[in-house]
Curated annotation (Swiss-Prot):
Keyword Repeat among UniProt keywords: yes
Record-stated family: Belongs to the orthopoxvirus OPG037 protein family.
GO biological process: symbiont-mediated perturbation of host apoptosis
Organism: Vaccinia virus (strain Copenhagen) (VACV)
Protein's name in the database: Inhibitor of Apoptosis OPG037
Keywords from the named record: ANK repeat, Early protein, Host cytoplasm, Host-virus interaction, Modulation of host cell apoptosis by virus, Repeat
Function, as annotated: Inhibits host apoptosis. Acts by associating with host apoptosome.
ANK repeats: 97-126, 130-161, 233-263, 267-297, 322-351, 353-377
Quaternary state and interactors: May interact with host caspase-9-Apaf-1 complex.
GO cellular component, one term: host cell cytoplasm
Length: 472
């Protein structure tokens, strides 16, 4: 392959020497650069061969971006780049991705090429399409990064003069810096106490990196960066670490003394509630609870919503008292574990069955029936059975009817259904069976009159109702 490339370029070079109008033929120029771009991908490059190849080359400004290609080769001898610069390739042109050669060399940590480009006029303050200068690209070993910072600053890189798309300067954009690099950047004038356009400081941003470390946050705090500052959404660093799927206990321990665990962001979440929502282990939640003098109702409600009976027990041990409202909520959200925990601690809601029906949690209805909760709950004139009709849920209705509602409950059920003009069709068979099994029901004039009207209003006109006349 390399022999073919050399031969092609040699042929182009000879043709150029024979034809004084060679460069008026753009195809020849582009062909030469094409073969030179192929040579960039060849592993064993020879500088003398490269120089010979360049004899057939003139910068064309086409899409091969020869200088960019060679600046992006790791470990490349800077003399290759020097030859291209001498040949007339500009260090201040962008490729199709908006990158300058200096950005590319910075990204791959080739400081010798960085130095070569700078000495040939590369602009250290040029911005790529992400509005980043070369100072933003600080990967590599500490020594490599510090050397590159020194080079860029020496050739005029401006401090605190640019922000990228996220509103970050070079220091803030470095989400996982070493202490040595961080201090170096600060020593040349970068401001450490700045935030990005979302209000996040260095600790926020470090916590959002792939591998946040307590040691990094520790020295950031020693340099004066606030561990409790909220961003524009109200999230403190503790909010961020508590919201992660994998919790870093060392970081939580570090941030805990400086942050109120009940401090809410604009979405109503606190570090404590975020721990509960992400199903964190109880011992970790207990760690945060131990720093709080107040356990809010919101915390209890979230424990119930996420079925965290283990956390309810911890909260109870810390003196929080539960009541029927908590039991009601546990029923409404279908939290079987929390209902069981509260029931074991003699906390109940008399109308629990009614709220279970409203929520249509069949498992909860079954659990309450098993524990002998009454089906005769009446709330604002509505019964469990009338709500089954409203919800058109014959399955739950059948479960309730098997547990012997009282005659008064059935009377109130009919009243509620008629008042709200609900569809009677699903309950008519159940009421008929109820009356059949409870003959005393029709001996009560109030019940019987209501039942007769309930049925006759439902059946088509012209049907005889003499069966009802035998009672009174």
């Amino acid at each position: 392959m390399i022999f073919v490339i050399e031969s092609k370029l040699l042929q182009i070079y000879r043709n150029r020497n024979r034809n004084i109008n060679f460069y008026t033929t753009m195809d020849n120029i582009m062909s030469a650069e094409y073969y030179l771009s192929l040579y960039a991908k060849y592993n064993s490059k020879n500088l003398d061969v490269f120089r010979n190849m360049l004899q057939a080359i003139e910068p064309s400004g086409n899409n091969y971006h020869i200088l960019h290609a060679y600046c992006g080769i790791k470990g490349l001898d800077e003399r290759f780049v020097e030859e291209l610069l001498h040949r007339g390739y500009s260090p201040n042109e962008t490729d199709d991705d908006g990158n300058y050669p200096l950005h590319i060399a910075s990204k791959i940590n080739n400081n010798r090429i960085v130095a070569m480009l700078l000495t040939h006029g590369a602009d250290p303050n040029a911005c790529d399409k992400h509005n980043k200068t070369p100072l933003y690209y600080l990967s590599g070993t500490d020594d490599e990064v510090i050397e590159r910072i020194n080079l860029l600053v020496q050739y005029g890189a401006k401090i605190n003069n640019s922000v990228d798309e996220e509103g970050c300067g070079p220091l803030l954009a470095c989400t996982d810096p070493s202490e040595r690099v961080f201090k170096k950047i600060m020593s040349i004038g970068f401001e450490a106490r700045i935030v990005d356009k979302f209000g996040k400081n260095h600790i926020h941003r470090h916590l959002m990196s792939d591998n946040p470390k307590a040691s990094t946050i520790s020295w950031m705090m020693k340099l004066g960066i606030s561990p409790s500052k909220p961003d524009h959404d109200g999230n403190t660093p503790l909010h961020i670490v508590c919201s992660k799927t994998v919790k870093n206990v060392d970081i939580i321990d570090l941030l805990l003394p400086s942050t109120d665990v009940n401090k809410q962001n604009k979405f109503g979440d606190s570090p404590l509630t975020l721990l509960i929502k992400t199903l964190s282990p109880a011992h970790l939640i207990n760690k945060l609870l131990s720093t709080s003098n107040v356990i809010t109702d919101q915390t209890v409600n979230i424990c119930i919503f996420y079925d965290r009976d283990d956390v309810l027990e911890i909260i109870n041990d810390k003196g929080k008292q539960y009541d029927s409202t908590d039991f009601k909520m546990a029923v409404e959200v279908g939290s079987i574990r929390c209902v069981k925990y509260l029931l074991d601690n003699d906390i109940i809601c008399e109308d629990a069955m009614y709220y279970a029906v409203l929520s249509e949690y069949e498992t909860m209805v079954d659990y309450l029936l098993f524990n002998h909760f009454s089906v005769d709950s009446v709330v604002n004139g509505h019964t469990c059975m009338s709500e089954c009709v409203r919800l058109n849920n014959p399955v739950i209705l059948s479960k309730l009817m098997l547990h012997n509602p009282t005659s008064e409950t059935m009377y109130l059920t009919m009243k509620a259904i008629e008042k709200d003009k609900l569809d009677k069709s699903i309950i008519i068979p159940f009421i008929a069976y109820f009356v059949l099994m409870h003959p005393d029901f029709c001996k009560n004039r109030r019940y019987f009159t209501s039942y007769k009207r309930f049925v006759t209003d439902y059946v088509h006109e012209g049907v005889s109702y003499e069966v009802f006349d035998d009672y009174f």
